[in-house]
Amino acid sequence: GKVDIHAEGIRPEWTDDKASITLDDLLRMQSGLAWDETYELGTPITEMLYRQDDMGDYAAARDLAHPVGAHRQYSTGSTQLVCDTVRQKLGVDDRDEAAALPYRWLLEPLGLRSARWEPDASGTTACGSYLWMTPRDWAALGMFARDDGRWDGKQLLPKGWMRSSTTEDPAEGEPEPYGSTWWLRTGAHQPPYFRSLPKDTYWMSGHDGQRTVVVPSADLVVVRMGFSPTYADQDPRVEQLVRAAIDAT
């Protein structure tokens, strides 16, 4: 109840059309802010991750390329803005206190002892990147989502959060179905991969082929780790692994 994800005017420097951007827009990658997620020299994603002391300020300064809420484009900058804006809303200015927020709210309550989530130079957690955990702890995070934010008998997320998070918004843009921070098996368009999996499947997609796949109907979470620079989303092996696990249950 401390932060309203549908409220406008969330950042004081946004006094133009950007003032209508909400946290929900950022979570759903439909803020309209100009972005390029291509990992090449000079693109916004590499500029933010490797050259900016305050990643949130950098992402907030991007110009609008589309009307707010009308176009979906995956952006690590949007994820960074969520954490930076929530930190501001909570009035947390101390660097160490800011870096401790995700541990206090998420990682410690779930008992994810291996987790290391790196902050940027300003102290704000680099929420779209730099989260290191063992496969077992990634699986625990997937189980937390599968159980609608309930853990060890406590409801840590509002009831129905995952239903909302795994519902696609009708914004135009990238064809792969996307909810609120989760890639989806079912949406306005069929994804080019994972088509053999149940329709309620959703997943986290990390760098170079890392995946945490949640299949609620099969009561299943599958984690694929590794460092595979040549991995492509259309690579069938993760889908085959999840399919085999489902068939074995």
Where are these regions (language model features)?
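Active-site Gly/Thr loop motif
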Residues: 112-119, 166-221
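Alpha-helical scaffold elements that line and support the substrate/ligand-binding pocket
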Residues: 1-4, 26, 72-106, 138-145, ...
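Carbohydrate-binding/catalytic loop surfaces
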Residues: 43-49, 120-133, 183-190
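Non-transmembrane alpha-helical segments in soluble domains
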Residues: 24-27, 56, 60, 83-87, ...
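Active-site helix/loop module of the DD-peptidase/beta-lactamase fold
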Residues: 1-33, 61-64, 91-129, 133, ...
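Catalytic cores of extracellular degradative/oxidative enzymes
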Residues: 9-14, 19, 25, 32-60, ...
